[in-house]
């Protein structure tokens, strides 16, 4: 798939999103910062990437996801848990960053902060019904299938 990428900050030419390995599903996104940003425990920040994308095809969307190492080792996760980029969005990719850890974290300029994953999208059309055809599960939820 081809993806239109617009560089909004010239410094990002040296830090284009890329897959870390041939098996990577996510493209690394970096913090486009002039200076380090310190996040105290509980702090949030909206971090620019200096990049914009345009998927154009309504059959695709992009997800901004946290990097597992930052979350596990430092408590740095996405403030909105997952960022959804619609196919028609053309603005700058911003990363809602939250320090849910117990210590301060310094985010450095151009540090890898999140990952971008392209996913297929199916847009549903609703069919209004009075009731559903019976299924094995029915309306059971919240532990109805058992534990373990």
Curated annotation (Swiss-Prot):
<dbReference type="InterPro" id="IPR033704">
    <property type="entry name" value="dUTPase_trimeric"/>
</dbReference>
<comment type="function">
    <text>This enzyme is involved in nucleotide metabolism: it produces dUMP, the immediate precursor of thymidine nucleotides and it decreases the intracellular concentration of dUTP so that uracil cannot be incorporated into DNA.</text>
</comment>
<dbReference type="Pfam" id="PF00692">
    <property type="entry name" value="dUTPase"/>
</dbReference>
<dbReference type="InterPro" id="IPR008181">
    <property type="entry name" value="dUTPase"/>
</dbReference>
<keyword id="KW-0479">Metal-binding</keyword>
<feature type="binding site">
    <location>
        <begin position="67"/>
        <end position="69"/>
    </location>
    <ligand>
        <name>substrate</name>
    </ligand>
</feature>
<keyword id="KW-0546">Nucleotide metabolism</keyword>
<protein>
    <recommendedName>
        <fullName>Deoxyuridine 5'-triphosphate nucleotidohydrolase</fullName>
        <ecNumber>3.6.1.23</ecNumber>
    </recommendedName>
</protein>
<keyword id="KW-0460">Magnesium</keyword>
<comment type="pathway">
    <text>Pyrimidine metabolism; dUMP biosynthesis; dUMP from dCTP (dUTP route): step 2/2.</text>
</comment>
<feature type="binding site">
    <location>
        <position position="94"/>
    </location>
    <ligand>
        <name>substrate</name>
    </ligand>
</feature>
<comment type="similarity">
    <text>Belongs to the dUTPase family.</text>
</comment>
<feature type="binding site">
    <location>
        <position position="80"/>
    </location>
    <ligand>
        <name>substrate</name>
    </ligand>
</feature>
<dbReference type="InterPro" id="IPR029054">
    <property type="entry name" value="dUTPase-like"/>
</dbReference>
<dbReference type="GO" id="GO:0046081">
    <property type="term" value="P:dUTP catabolic process"/>
</dbReference>
<dbReference type="GO" id="GO:0004170">
    <property type="term" value="F:dUTP diphosphatase activity"/>
</dbReference>
<dbReference type="GO" id="GO:0006226">
    <property type="term" value="P:dUMP biosynthetic process"/>
</dbReference>
<dbReference type="InterPro" id="IPR036157">
    <property type="entry name" value="dUTPase-like_sf"/>
</dbReference>
<keyword id="KW-0378">Hydrolase</keyword>
<dbReference type="GO" id="GO:0000287">
    <property type="term" value="F:magnesium ion binding"/>
</dbReference>
<feature type="binding site">
    <location>
        <begin position="84"/>
        <end position="86"/>
    </location>
    <ligand>
        <name>substrate</name>
    </ligand>
</feature>
């Amino acid at each position: 798939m081809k993806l239109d990428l617009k560089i909004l900050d010239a410094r990002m030419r040296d830090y284009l999103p890329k897959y870390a390995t041939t098996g990577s599903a996510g493209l690394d996104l970096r913090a486009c910062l002039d200076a380090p940003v310190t996040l105290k425990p509980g702090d949030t920040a909206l971090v620019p990437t200096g990049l914009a994308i345009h998927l154009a095809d309504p059959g695709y969307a992009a997800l901004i996801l946290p990097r597992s190492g930052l979350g596990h080792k430092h408590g740095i996760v996405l403030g909105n848990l997952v960022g959804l980029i619609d196919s028609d969005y053309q603005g700058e990719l911003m990363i809602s960053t939250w320090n849910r850890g117990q210590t301060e974290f310094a985010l450095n300029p151009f540090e890898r902060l999140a990952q971008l994953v392209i996913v297929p999208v199916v847009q549903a059309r609703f069919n209004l019904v009075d009731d559903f055809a019976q299924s094995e599960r029915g309306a059971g939820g919240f532990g109805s299938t058992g534990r373990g």
